[in-house]
């Protein structure tokens, strides 16, 4: 449908209405893979929260690769830093193909299709094959949140209830009883297909 895309397939600009294109400043002839999203508890038990990439993106402007399999070898580079613009955008979950209420902040790369270096990646992009993207990252600010009555975990319990309602799949966090709140992280050199 219009306005929806899979984060692993990237964004097909030709299928979006003009208002969506304008809100992202998107251009035809570019590939827009979603590398990461916020407000979701993953299998690692961490939850990224909006604006966690702000400092890193400013510090690394023009220095982030798009690669295959987190490999920075010359034969794995999909796009070099000079051709990768990295930004965040708050979007509805449906926009990234998920059936949750509310929104997420997506970490998105903008890459000219004619600058894609790796033939295997070109095929994945052209065929719109569903393949996972991810970011090589380093935590900067991470906090332990726990739904516990233990006297030594008072602050952790407060964190749990301060953040739980922002998590799209909060039932998973409630069942587990804890999660890691990530409020700042660094992109370490690359995002990967």
Model-found features: residue ranges?
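Signature of dsDNA virion morphogenesis modules
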Residues: 1-193
């Amino acid at each position: 449908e219009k306005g929806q895309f899979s984060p692993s397939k990237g964004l097909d600009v030709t299928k979006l209405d003009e208002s969506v294109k304008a809100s992202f400043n998107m251009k035809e002839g570019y590939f827009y893979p979603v590398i990461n999203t916020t407000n979701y508890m993953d299998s690692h038990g961490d939850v990224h929260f909006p604006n966690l990439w702000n400092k890193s993106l400013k510090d690394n402007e023009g220095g982030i690769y798009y690669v295959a399999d987190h490999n920075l070898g010359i034969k794995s580079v999909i796009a070099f830093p000079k051709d990768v613009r990295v930004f965040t955008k708050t979007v509805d979950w449906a926009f990234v193909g998920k059936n949750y209420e509310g929104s997420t902040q997506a970490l998105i790369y903008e890459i000219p299709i004619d600058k894609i270096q790796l033939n295997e990646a070109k095929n994945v992009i052209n065929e719109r094959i569903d393949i996972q993207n991810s970011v090589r990252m380093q935590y900067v600010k991470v906090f332990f949140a726990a739904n516990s009555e233990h006297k030594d975990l008072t602050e952790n319990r407060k964190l749990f209830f301060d953040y739980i309602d922002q998590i799209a799949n909060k039932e998973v966090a409630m069942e587990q009883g804890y999660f890691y709140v990530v409020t700042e992280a660094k992109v370490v050199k690359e995002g990967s297909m």
